[in-house]
Amino acid sequence: MILAAQNSVFVHIRRGDYVGIGCQLGIDYQKKALEYMAKRVPNMELFVFCEDLKFTQNLDLGYPFIDMTTRDKEEEAYWDMLLMQSCQHGIIANSTYSWWAAYLIKNPEKIIIGPKHWLFGHENILCKEWVKIESHFEVKSKKYNA
């Protein structure tokens, strides 16, 4: 499916251990990133990776997507990494897991979008050619700038 897609884009949404401790990104980050990507990648095919099946079942990103969420993330982590790096472009979370998937994409014309704000002040973690999008962290529906 991903390999057959002409303009595949992965979106990684990290929740899991980030939820409740103030580390998960607000969904507006992914929406802004998708708006940016849609202007540059015609007919993009989105593949969403997340470890929270309940969350993705009700997710509205403003664009149609294929939900790649699996029930057992620990057993499927290597497979998700392989699938994400098989995409042509990527939108990463504030996670080194999706950072590596994006870094390993072989497309020399790849567009990678990452959050401007990372944990613990690691603001320069993105590669220089990657696009930084403004982001914030969410805690129990309250927004805090990182």
Residue ranges and their predicted role:
Residues 1-75:
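Core catalytic architecture of nucleotide-activated donor-dependent transferases building glycoconjugates
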Residues 10, 65-67, 112, 130-132, ...:
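Conserved beta-strand scaffold positions in the cores of enzyme catalytic domains, especially
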Residues 41-125:
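Donor-binding and catalytic core of enzymes assembling or modifying cell-surface/extracellular glycoconjugates
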Residues 121-146:
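Leloir-type glycosyltransferase catalytic cores
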